[in-house]
Amino acid sequence: MATVHEIEQRLFSWAPRESAMDWDNVGHLVGDPEQEVERILVALDITERVVQEAIDCGAQLIVSHHPVMNVRWHEREMQTLRPDTRLGGVLTTLVKNAISAICMHTNLDAADGGVNDCLAKKLGLNDVFLLNDEKIGRIGTLSCEKGLEEFLRDVIELLGCGGLRYCRGSGRVHRVAVGGGACGEYIPQAIAQGCDTFVTSDLRYNDFLDTRGLNLIDAGHFPTENVVCPTVKAYLEEHFPEVKTVISTSHRDVIQYYL
């Protein structure tokens, strides 16, 4: 039976640790590296609900995209390990139930076939290539040019968005940049690369002020990244066929829209 360490190393052969941002926290973050794994739960985040789902389904390992702990987001919480905090409660429950956690974040964003390639594929982009040297983001073209309203409807349907925010630029959609998760900082690069549209998430008000003709679409953090989970599942099944791998059904987008 495969161990947590063996699974981590196999995932790193797809999405190397070295390709993660220097502030990121990736790899095996919780549990015994020599623990044998019979069942894996794949999820975008490791929340209380996801941990309970892992307990209920008998998983020894959760493979997530977002790190269960990262000093960039959890600096104060990481100073203690208390079950009465959100992070402390998650970590305590994982350890008590001998459930390990492997997290593949910005290294999976950058990986061939990772988050951004999955997002580009889901949106039907062709001739996909890198948006930037960091490999966070992709550019591709639609088979046929579309009007913005038609493309917005496609994004909602294909990604399962509850809604989206957007700013009209040229109003036509053909050459599209994508950035799963928070990629507003790459708007100038999308413009410089001649894109007419950029699909990403977590955009600020100021991001929408100077788009210079770019159709800017905030499709949500969860919808733009959750597309990678089936690919992670397929990768694990290919390399560890003896291990049962399932995608979380309890974890959904926590952001809702009132229209």
Name every feature range the model reports, one short phrase each.
Residues 1-259:
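Active-site catalytic microenvironments in core metabolic enzymes, especially phosphate/sugar-handling
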